[in-house]
Structures are given as C-alpha cells and as structure tokens.
Amino acid sequence: MARGKFITFEGIDGAGKTTHLQWFCERLQAKLAAGDRQVVVTREPGGTPLGEALREMLLNQPMDLETEALLMFAARREHLARVIEPALARGDWVVSDRFTDATFAYQGGGRGLPRDKLEALERWVQGGFQPDLTVLFDVAPQVASERRGAARAPDKFESETDAFFTRTRDEYLRRAQEAPHRFTIVDATQTIPEIRGRLERVLAAL
C-alpha cells in the first residue's frame, strides 16, 4: 500500500479550526474507506501519553521561553516516532490539530523566539519532513478574542493579548506565503456552511 498523507489544521486560538476538524476527518474517512485506509486524528502538543503530559505543563505552567520551545519539540519527536510516522508507513492518513507551524507562530511570532533557533530544532526533530497539506484558518485577533470569551476557562495561551495574536497570525501568514504549495487558507470569518463548502473543495482535490 502507498504511503499515507499528513494533513494539519492550523490557526490562532478562536479561529474555529477544531470545530471543523472532526467533520473533515469523517468526510475524509468516507472518501478513503474503499481503499481500506484509516484516518488517524491527533493533536499537538499531545498525541501520545508523554505528549499529553507535556501538553498539560505547556498550557498551564509558566516557564522560560526556550524551555517551552524545547518541550514542544520533545513532544513532537515522540508524536512523530510513536504515531505519525508508523501510521503513514501503514498507508493510513493522519490529520493533526496543529504541528510545527504552530510553534513558529506562537513561540516565534507571538513570543519572539528567534527563527533560527526554531529552524535548528525543526531540522533536528523532523529532518525534511513536512505536512502534505496545511489548512490555515485565518481570522482577525479581535474576532478570535470574542469567540474565546464565550468558551471554557482559558489556558495561558488563550489568555494572551490581541497584540500577541496579531504577531502569531502574521507569522502563520508568512509561513503560508513561503510554502503556497502546502498551505490552503480558509477565511474563518465565514459561516459554518461556507467554511464546510470550502473544505469540501479541499477534500475533492485530495
């Protein structure tokens, strides 16, 4: 069986990506069913027992910026080794709620960690491995903030300022501009039916 594909969903907190991820995965599974392939749904940070333990620390405990980035990539290495790479080798498809683009956006753009440090970690942990497709849910930080305000108690990232999320969004868009072959940008201010129509077109092209 041919190697599977790796798809990531990205966007600032409040963009709505997680709302659409399960629906997208159900549609993708239906599309792949005839070929006896499975869709593995996962997330970052997380996806493994170690990754989930690190997620709890990363989202809720204050820490040094470089420590934060190192833990993100430690969780990612475990995720790649235990979940993503084995699934792709089996011919399954993997859909992840966030991946490395989020680290560049949040720790790089948002928190200001120099890009060269993140690029060095990326090379060490991933080599040349990148998603086959990244769906970026783009929304203005002010809109995302209003959405987050109606959600559950915020973690330390969700509690950040609009200025932080503006820098984070800008870095996401920079990443998308540098890799247009990999990114599909979704206008996350649209209605749910409009966004799902856009995702249907993404699915049709896979």
Curated annotation (Swiss-Prot):
Keyword Metal-binding in record: no
List, alphabetically, the GO terms of the cellular component aspect.
cytosol
Q: What is this protein called?
A: Thymidylate kinase
Q: What class of enzyme is it?
A: transferase
Tell me what gene encodes this: tmk
Protein function: Phosphorylation of dTMP to form dTDP in both de novo and salvage pathways of dTTP synthesis.
The entry's ATP-binding residues are: 11-18
Which GO terms of type biological process are on file? dTDP biosynthetic process; dTTP biosynthetic process; dUDP biosynthetic process
In its keyword annotation, does this UniProt entry include Kinase?
A: yes
Q: Which reaction does it catalyse?
A: dTMP + ATP = dTDP + ADP
GO MF entries: ATP binding; dTMP kinase activity
Q: Which domain of life is it from?
A: Bacteria
Q: Which family does it belong to?
A: Belongs to the thymidylate kinase family.
Give the EC number(s) listed in the UniProt record. 2.7.4.9
Q: Where is the signal peptide?
A: none
For this UniProt record, the keywords arranged alphabetically read as follows: ATP-binding, Kinase, Nucleotide biosynthesis, Nucleotide-binding, Transferase
